[in-house]
A protein has these predicted regions:
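Short, solvent-exposed amphipathic alpha-helical segments in soluble enzyme
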Residues: 114, 139, 275-281
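A conserved active-site cap/scaffold subdomain adjacent to cofactor or substrate pockets
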Residues: 171-187
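Residue-level signature of catalytic and energy-coupling elements of molecular machines
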Residues: 1, 20, 113, 148, ...
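A short acidic Gly-Thr/Ser loop motif
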Residues: 22-24, 146-153, 159-162, 171-175, ...
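Glycine-rich phosphate-binding loops at beta-strand->alpha-helix junctions
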Residues: 22, 200-203, 255-279
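N-terminal phosphate-binding loop and adjacent alpha-helix
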Residues: 1-10, 178-182, 293-299
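Nucleotide/phosphate-binding catalytic cleft detector across ATP-hydrolyzing
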Residues: 1-145, 163-165, 174, 188, ...
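Conserved phosphate-binding/catalytic loops in two-lobed NTP-binding clefts
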Residues: 46, 50, 279-300
Length: 300
């Protein structure tokens, strides 16, 4: 409630309802196919498409809720169509990508806001809101992956033909780099400062750079330069290996013509763009920074 009061003071307006973003490790996607056999050949109607959507949402998933649905395509005969309405057929398959999360996630959020006396207007899937803010229509259409390097997690979203094709949350982020530096008997606050000031995501072995024996901050602590570089680069490589594994699992690793769009606090490390280019098979990498989230959607 104190946050709401601060916002109301800043906006000079009262807040009746709030939008709540859902992200983090509980999010993932699963695929589902719904089939309808028709008694005779007839034109596919919007009502039939809606029925497929409803059946998909009713699929039981133990301890999980379907938060959003991204229709992938519809198989009519031998053709895969984004919009089959009006096409004659006696058989249709609807293919869906369901974004799911543990049931306890929404339950806990509902409980917290109810106790605070704040009404929830709607839930927003944070990775989808981020995609609306940073991706261009061309990137979504041509095929791209959006990587959000957070403190505790790294979120991977894959788009092709303006449709979300895959979403996964990796339990690794910038704070893991900080913790690795802490293992050298350095306090967390100092480790974070060393990371931000001297951290390098990629060291080009072909370049002869002036050697620095130690990195230090305000005389408080120091660390051997090569050791800090090894620590940061090793963890970045691990995160990028996990990112690329998700891209391969999506089945779109060779279909992303627009490459990768990288954002998030941990993406600000020096040479992150180069690291991404070297550690993945994508030629195009765009760093997207300081983007504001939007609530507009492209998901049913």
């Amino acid at each position: 409630t104190s946050i709401i009061k601060k916002l109301e003071s800043t906006l000079k307006a009262s807040i009746g309802k709030v939008y709540v973003g859902i992200g983090g490790q509980s999010l993932r996607t699963i695929r589902n196919t719904e089939v309808r056999h028709l008694e005779e050949e007839t034109k596919i109607s919007q009502e039939l498409i809606d029925s497929l959507m409803d059946s998909n949402r009713e699929v039981p998933i133990i301890d999980q809720d379907i938060l959003e649905v991204a229709p992938q395509e519809y198989k009519v005969g031998i053709n895969l169509l984004a919009d089959p309405v009006g096409v004659p057929s006696d058989h249709i398959e609807g293919r869906f990508l369901n974004i799911i999360a543990r049931s306890s996630v929404k339950q806990n959020i509902d409980k917290c806001f109810h106790q605070a006396g704040i009404e929830i207007a709607d839930y927003v899937i944070s990775p989808l809101a981020l995609a609306n803010a940073v991706l261009t229509n061309s990137e979504r259409r041509s095929g791209c992956m959006l990587i959000d390097f957070g403190a505790d997690t790294t979120t991977v979203s894959v788009y092709k033909n303006n449709i979300l094709r895959h979403l996964a949350v990796i339990p690794l982020g910038g704070s893991n780099i900080t913790k690795d530096i802490c293992s050298q008997q350095i306090e967390e606050e100092d480790a974070e400062e060393l990371k931000l000031k001297y951290g390098n995501a990629y060291i080009d072995p072909s370049k002869d750079e002036e050697e620095t024996p130690n990195y230090a901050i305000d005389g408080k602590c120091s660390i051997e330069a090569h050791l800090l570089e090894d620590i940061v680069e090793a963890r970045v490589n691990e995160i990028l290996a996990n990112v690329w594994n998700q891209i391969v699992l999506s089945g779109y690793d060779d279909k992303l013509l627009a490459g990768a769009i990288v954002t998030g606090g941990a993406a600000n490390l020096k040479n992150m763009e180069e690291a991404f280019s070297k550690r993945t098979k994508l030629e195009k990498v765009r760093m997207a920074k300081d983007s504001q989230l939007s609530l507009k959607g492209g998901i049913e």
